[in-house]
Amino acid sequence: MPLTNTPETLNILNPDFRMPEHCGGDRWSILHGDSLQILRQFEPNSFDAIITDPPYASGGSSQTTKSRSTNEKYSSMSKEKALPDFDSDQMDQLSWMFWTAAWLQDARRIAKPGAPVCLFIDWRQLPAMTLALQWAGWTWRGVAVWDKVASRPQKGRFRQQSEYIVWGSNGKMPLERNVGCLPGVFRYPNPQNRIHVTEKPLQLMRDVVQICEPGGRILDPFAGAGTTVLAAVQEGYEAVGIEMSDAYFQRSAERLKTALESEVNQN
């Protein structure tokens, strides 16, 4: 099926909402805008899972180090090769917790009963994320690990080679869901040729989205490079992403078009 600019997934938005800039195709869409504004425009019970890699507002133990650009905090690329920075990553911890709880509360309203939520985070913000999740009314169910396999060695210290997936559900989560047993540790190196500063490996996300029941609709409120949306579509789901950055909206839309058009042509 050819890609279009008016995917059916956008029918779950409030009909009175002025449609933001968007791009999409068969079973996917990316909306350009602020998640705090757009999340409130979806109809209740619209999504079977919320899976996202939000801004961590981390990268240091002091406000001075946290206030650096995302490239300075999370990338070792030279200035000539640096990727675009992204917003909402310079908050102090209390502000970040309130902001995170706010969008998670909006996300819970539009998630179906029992829908899983998966949130990537680093070790510094791990405790705060578990609190924000519960403040927003979700049931916290555990933490999975992304083992990045390698990281910069530090003499006399443990390697910081892991990030975490805080996960939970919108209330009770029936054991009879049509989902298999998923691992608690995912081992994948950082992707090469990234288009986003904190891009996650595609195969990692293809594994993680399988927490959703087959054929469900997945929301990523912080789409970034579009990896979650791409992984979801490749695994047979519908997916909606939201991205505030002009640069990353364009990059993710182009990536999805290219990847999914290629798959359509091959089939």
What is each stretch, according to the model?
Residues 1-150, 156, 160, 172-174, ...:
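S-adenosyl-L-methionine-dependent nucleic acid methyltransferase catalytic domains
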Residues 161-165:
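Short hydrophobic/aromatic beta-strand or adjacent loop that forms the aromatic wall/cage
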